[in-house]
């Protein structure tokens, strides 16, 4: 899975962009935000609550990072589970 595929899923499922940031694409920061970042040769998933990190994990591949992003968000948006 790639970032573009992940963005397509988020839009298809009508997940408001204010709750996520994928490589800088997303809305303003709300209470809980899921961030997908690309740093060097690693991919990072951060989850922040009120601008405080509550989850921070690095991945070797974009596919792993995107799937983990969906897995974490599926706790709040169960409709995302079908993409994992």
Question: Where do the PLM segments sit?
Answer:
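Short aromatic-glycine-(Arg/Gly/Cys) micro-motifs in beta-strand/loop hairpins
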Residues: 27-54, 72
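A short, charged, amphipathic alpha-helix used as a generic interaction element across diverse proteins
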Residues: 60-75
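Negatively charged, low-complexity tracts enriched in Asp/Glu with abundant Ser/Thr
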Residues: 1-28, 83
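Phosphoinositide-binding peripheral membrane targeting modules
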Residues: 57
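Intrinsically disordered, low-complexity charged/polar segments
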Residues: 76-84
């Amino acid at each position: 899975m790639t970032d573009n595929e992940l963005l397509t899923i988020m839009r298809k499922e009508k997940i408001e962009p204010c709750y996520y940031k994928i490589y800088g694409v997303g809305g303003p920061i709300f209470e809980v935000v899921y961030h997908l970042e690309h740093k060097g040769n690693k991919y990072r998933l951060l989850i922040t609550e009120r601008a405080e990190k509550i989850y921070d994990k690095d991945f070797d591949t974009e596919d792993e990072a995107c799937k983990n992003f969906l897995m974490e968000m599926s706790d709040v948006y169960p409709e995302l589970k079908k993409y994992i």
